[in-house]
């Protein structure tokens, strides 16, 4: 075995559907300053208020989609890890979660103890956001610094416009699109608008309806919304979809702050009102199915759409461990630049 490891990193999951485990997970997640970017006292107060009721509600939601093997996100990520072991010939392939287990800290320590000296860190987020990509990288930096680990890193950058990722999306989604549909909704995870403004010193973001399409390369590099729209446009182009056949929305809004629009819950009602009966929904910001896809879209979203007058909502599975995605990820990781 060589000393160059691949570390796949995703968001994470509670250890179980018990309320105590869900509360512990939500506390770790929401107290991350890259997720709720408020000063510590305000963040602590807000999270404490959220944790009064949300753990029980979230535990119920997790229980509705939990598998016998465990959390769908963790199970599917493990399957991807196992598949990558047959493609990554440079050393061990490990999986870590930013929140929950297996932790980034324990995984990096284990790799260092095994004699690994080079790590390709792969945050499994196609589009860039501080609350996803940055927090994974910063956690790895913290661990290396505090534990004095002798590790060098290359980091997989956002791959929202990379042909390998887009081709894998096409390969995984094509069988569902070929079954016939009235409309395709590309539902990305949402973000508070302030997250975009914070990373845009130029003041370009959200200044007009067309701001994402006219973004400079510098703005595009850190604008999550622009990267989502670019992914959607490139996917639709590859699939030969006409503009009226598809649209984009943003899901998973939390709290009362203004988040990027349009909201998925609003679009579901609008599409039903427009006469759409057979709706396909893809979630291209997620590479593995999780509570946001299986429960928020596959269960609650379907129920909302049907109640609004639609007939069926088909959730297209995420990339998960699709063979084309495994092959694509190998290529993307092997050309990851040196960083950290």
Swiss-Prot record:
InterPro entries in alphabetical order: Ferrochelatase (IPR001015), Ferrochelatase_C (IPR033644), Ferrochelatase_N (IPR033659)
Reaction catalysed by this enzyme: heme b + 2 H(+) = protoporphyrin IX + Fe(2+)
Binding site residues for Fe cation: 189, 292
GO biological process assignments: heme biosynthetic process
One CC-aspect GO term: cytoplasm
EC number(s) given by UniProt: 4.98.1.1
Name of one Pfam family that matches: Ferrochelatase
Coiled coil: none
Domain of life assignment: Bacteria
Keywords linked to the UniProt accession: Cytoplasm, Heme biosynthesis, Iron, Lyase, Metal-binding, Porphyrin biosynthesis
Gene Ontology MF, one: metal ion binding
The protein's annotated pathway: Porphyrin-containing compound metabolism; protoheme biosynthesis; protoheme from protoporphyrin-IX: step 1/1
Keyword Cytoplasm included in the entry's annotation: yes
Subcellular localization(s) per the UniProt record: Cytoplasm
Role this protein plays: Catalyzes the ferrous insertion into protoporphyrin IX.
PANTHER family the UniProt entry points to: FERROCHELATASE, FERROCHELATASE, MITOCHONDRIAL
Family statement drawn from the similarity comment of this UniProt entry: Belongs to the ferrochelatase family.
HAMAP family xrefs: Ferrochelatase
Protein name, entry field: Ferrochelatase
Species in which this protein is naturally found: Ectopseudomonas mendocina (strain ymp)
